[in-house]
């Protein structure tokens, strides 16, 4: 079983990218579990066709310790196993701590013991690489990390920060970076810039996802692009990304860069000039 965590700054399209990629892998015959590690609890919405998924933390708050796996796990598109860790009540507690609680509970309930599982995907909020959000890295819950990024300064800054987290836990947790996924914002020279960033970080840009309105249309209809419009070229982009992840063999401990180098990249490609 391959355990993959998808990180990236908030609003970058991480959950959308994860779910569409998972749909591509499911279509290719793989059995997958998706664990949402974001307090917004939107990591499985498209796979469940908008069905409200009761989060692990909400279930624990309401049911106490008497929780069974079926309470926190729903089957979605193509038999995908879907679960959301959720977050604390607003203004109370730590969302990162909630991720730790959720993953531990899933382990206790035997969620990972399904022998048919080929992949587990963790969809993780990535602006803050605090202890809880770093848990999939820190405790070896995930072995491969992919970072969703775009040609915008803060998305690149977050990607670099996440790489620092990977370096910190690479030896103890055994995790490696599998590559950057560029979710395009149609920034000038974006593809070249992210390829250059990947090179500086010692990794690869595993795929460039073009900006396309069908993604939003599919989301409004609570579906992945692959389910909503399977013949569309954008569906093929996600299939291609799924195939590249499935066949990927380039895993590295990244080499994070200084902020000055990041700014130089932006100047070189004309964004900050």
UniProtKB/Swiss-Prot annotation:
Keywords: 4Fe-4S, ADP-ribosylation, ATP-binding, Iron, Iron-sulfur, Metal-binding, Nitrogen fixation, Nucleotide-binding, Oxidoreductase
Binding site for ATP: 8-15
Pfam family, one: Fer4_NifH
Cofactor: [4Fe-4S] cluster
Membrane spanning residue stretches: none
Gene Ontology molecular functions: 4 iron, 4 sulfur cluster binding; ATP binding; metal ion binding; nitrogenase activity
ADP-ribosylarginine PTM positions: 97
Post-translational modification: The reversible ADP-ribosylation of Arg-97 inactivates the nitrogenase reductase and regulates nitrogenase activity.
Biological process annotations from GO: nitrogen fixation
Domain of life, source organism: Bacteria
Function, in words: The key enzymatic reactions in nitrogen fixation are catalyzed by the nitrogenase complex, which has 2 components: the iron protein and the molybdenum-iron protein.
HAMAP family: NifH
NCBIfam families for the chain: nifH
Quaternary structure and partners: Homodimer.
Family named by the database record: Belongs to the NifH/BchL/ChlL family.
Entry protein name: Nitrogenase iron protein
Organism of provenance: Desulforapulum autotrophicum (strain ATCC 43914 / DSM 3382 / VKM B-1955 / HRM2) (Desulfobacterium autotrophicum)
Gene: nifH
